[in-house]
UniProtKB/Swiss-Prot annotation:
Cysteine disulfide links: none
Subunit composition and interactions: Homodimer. Part of the Cas1-Cas2 complex. Forms a hexamer with 2 Cas1 dimers sandwiching a Cas2 dimer. The DNA lies across a flat surface extending from 1 Cas1 dimer, across the Cas2 dimer and contacting the other Cas1 dimer. Only 1 Cas1 protein from each dimer is catalytic, the other interacts with the Cas2 dimer and possibly target DNA.
Any one GO molecular function term: DNA binding
Function: CRISPR (clustered regularly interspaced short palindromic repeat), is an adaptive immune system that provides protection against mobile genetic elements (viruses, transposable elements and conjugative plasmids). CRISPR clusters contain sequences complementary to antecedent mobile elements and target invading nucleic acids. CRISPR clusters are transcribed and processed into CRISPR RNA (crRNA). The Cas1-Cas2 complex is involved in CRISPR adaptation, the first stage of CRISPR immunity, being required for the addition/removal of CRISPR spacers at the leader end of the CRISPR locus.
Deletion consequences: Loss of plasmid silencing.
Protein name according to UniProt: CRISPR-associated endoribonuclease Cas2
Gene transcribed to yield this protein: ygbF
UniProt comment concerning the protein's domains: Substrate DNA-binding induces large structural changes that generate a surface for DNA-binding across the Cas2 dimer and formation of an optimal catalytic site.
EC numbers on record: 3.1.-.-
UniProt record similarity statement: Belongs to the CRISPR-associated endoribonuclease Cas2 protein family. E.coli-subtype subfamily.
Regulation: induction: Repressed by H-NS. Activated by LeuO. Activated by the BaeSR two-component regulatory system, possibly due to envelope stress. Part of the casABCDE-ygbT-ygbF operon.
InterPro entries, sorted: CRISPR-assoc_prot_Cas2_sub
NCBIfam families cross-referenced by the UniProt entry: cas_CT1978
EC category name: hydrolase
């Protein structure tokens, strides 16, 4: 089990309700919980299927250099980039 954080923007209410089944919504669109890898993958499938035009970032604790991993869904000005094996975030100007 590992700590999981999901941040959503402009997603349908049905996805927010679905996330609230497994995670605690601590602020509007911000969900946290302690889940297994299998549940994390299942949550991501729900996000990919229900997010529509919204965007989502999901981050979880891992045994890596940074101590976490993340993935994104949908259009966003922040895009993940790989720099020599280190995942960073590039901010695109308007």
């Amino acid at each position: 089990m590992s700590m999981l954080v999901v941040v959503t923007e402009n997603v349908p209410p049905r996805l927010r309700g679905r996330l609230a089944i497994w995670l605690l919504e601590v602020r509007a669109g911000v969900y946290v919980g302690d889940v297994s890898a299998k549940i994390r993958e299942m949550i991501w499938e729900q996000i990919a299927g229900l997010a529509e035009e919204g965007n989502v970032v999901m981050a979880w604790a891992t045994n890596t250099e940074t101590g976490f991993e993340f993935q994104t869904f949908g259009l966003n000005r922040r895009t993940p980039v790989d720099l020599d094996g280190l995942r960073l975030v590039s901010f695109l100007p308007v």
